[in-house]
Design a protein with these regions (language model features):
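Active-site rim elements
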Residues: 48-55, 131-138, 226-229, 294-301, ...
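Surface-exposed helix-capping loop/turn segments at secondary-structure junctions
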Residues: 70-76, 153-164, 222-226, 250-254, ...
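Acidic/His/Gly-enriched intrinsically disordered linker/tail segments
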Residues: 236-309, 317, 336-338
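Extracellular Ig-like/FN3 beta-sandwich strand-entry sites
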Residues: 6-8
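Active-site-adjacent structural elements in folded domains
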Residues: 169-171, 199-204, 225, 280-299, ...
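Juxtacatalytic substrate-recognition/specificity segment
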Residues: 64, 115-231, 242
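Extended, low-hydrophobicity, Ser/Thr/Pro/Gly-biased non-transmembrane segments
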Residues: 10-110
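Amphipathic alpha-helical substructures
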Residues: 133, 254, 300-362
């Protein structure tokens, strides 16, 4: 569609109805979705792209209105705030918000919102009503406060926050989530009862909740190259270590030693006694499906248990917790290489003044 040649125009685009999705696409998690209980519209899926139209000083000033069932709350991804401007007799509500871009991302669903003050920020925490019992049992709001207070004090502010506010949005997202412009996504799969009972991530549901939230710093705030599947260096090492430190601060050294360090050590001891670790040729001879299952289990131990032990040893070698905090704060706030923005194991070793051999656990 060609636009008028006037210097300034007001462009209104209306569309509605309930589009039909490919049956296979509709069951895939992540990406654009329109259903009776959840909505995700991204960029051109939300508003057609403007071509050959330069932005003004304030970008592309845009007002977006959307009418949805009254049970659904609208959450723009970013700093924009959506407000209800009309309620219809057919059980729908019209929401409106302003933006400075022609696209953007919009989420909507039957969300519960909790407002939390932590780390010098006002946090809007959104999660699905169907997860309410699980989230309350896990102490989700308390976990958010603990993590944000601790990580902000020890590592620094999240680069994708506005400084004053942050939206944490539970969503159907693939790849662990993403963050920008004062908002961050949390994968709803991380907050199921099954995941929250994973003892490899914490001593209970509340501690697993802490683990998943720490990924806002180690995983989103700082990214890790996951291309080498054999590497024990990943976002999990620093995330598990940070969870241990938070738990140690909350429940004391004895609890943290029993539920974290001792369990890491037991898992690592068992790893090096494992038949397939000692006889890798036998592992390679297995059928692919069985080989992958065993390899994934072994990699889990290395990333979630062995790496935290190495970080703990590094902590002792550099002079204790305060020294390690200074090192991690420096790494978290380092100047990134735009061509390779990942935090590497060598970066960590260099910051500690250590070598790989220094952190051998034998």
């Amino acid at each position: 569609m060609a636009l008028p040649s006037d210097r300034e125009i007001e462009l209104t685009m209306d569309y509605g109805g309930f589009p039909r999705e490919n049956r296979n696409v509709s069951i895939m998690q992540g990406g654009t979705e329109i259903s009776s209980e959840y909505l995700c519209l991204e960029n051109a899926g939300l508003s057609p792209r403007l071509i050959n139209v330069l932005p003004g000083e304030n970008g592309y000033p845009t007002t977006i209105e959307i009418t949805l069932p009254a049970s659904m709350s609208v959450i723009p991804f970013g700093a924009s705030k959506a407000e209800v401007v009309a309620e219809q007799t057919d059980g729908t509500k019209t929401w409106r918000y302003d933006s400075n871009s022609a696209g953007g991302i919009l989420y909507a669903g039957d969300y519960i919102r909790q407002d939390i003050q932590a780390g010098g920020m006002d946090i809007e925490f959104y999660y699905g009503r169907k997860h309410q019992a699980v989230m309350e049992a896990a102490g989700a709001a308390e976990a958010v406060k603990s993590v944000v207070d601790y990580c902000t004090a020890h590592y620094g502010m999240l680069s994708f926050g506005t400084g004053d506010t942050l939206k944490l949005i539970q969503s159907r997202v693939t790849g662990g989530g993403y963050a920008a412009n004062g908002a961050s996504l949390l994968d709803e799969a991380d907050f199921t009862a099954d995941n929250l009972s994973d003892t490899g991530k914490g001593g209970g549901a509340g501690e697993v909740m802490i683990h998943e939230l720490v990924h806002q710093w180690w995983g989103l705030g700082n990214m890790f190259d996951a291309s080498d599947e054999s590497s024990l260096w990943s976002a999990e090492g620093l995330t598990v270590y940070t969870t241990y430190r938070i738990v140690k601060e909350r429940y004391g050294p004895s609890y943290a030693q029993e539920h974290y360090v001792d369990q890491w050590q037991q898992a690592v001891d068992n790893y090096y006694l494992n038949f397939y670790v000692r006889n890798p040729d036998y592992l390679e001879a297995l059928p692919e499906e069985e080989r992958l299952e065993i390899s994934n289990s072994l990699r889990y131990v290395r990333q979630y248990c062995e790496m935290p032990l190495k970080i703990l040893k590094a902590e002792q070698l550099v002079g204790g917790e305060e020294a390690m905090d200074r090192i991690l704060r420096g790494l978290f706030n380092r100047e990134l290489d735009p061509m390779y923005p990942y935090l590497t194991y060598q970066d960590f070793l260099n910051a500690c003044g250590l070598t790989e051999e220094d952190l051998n656990l034998a």
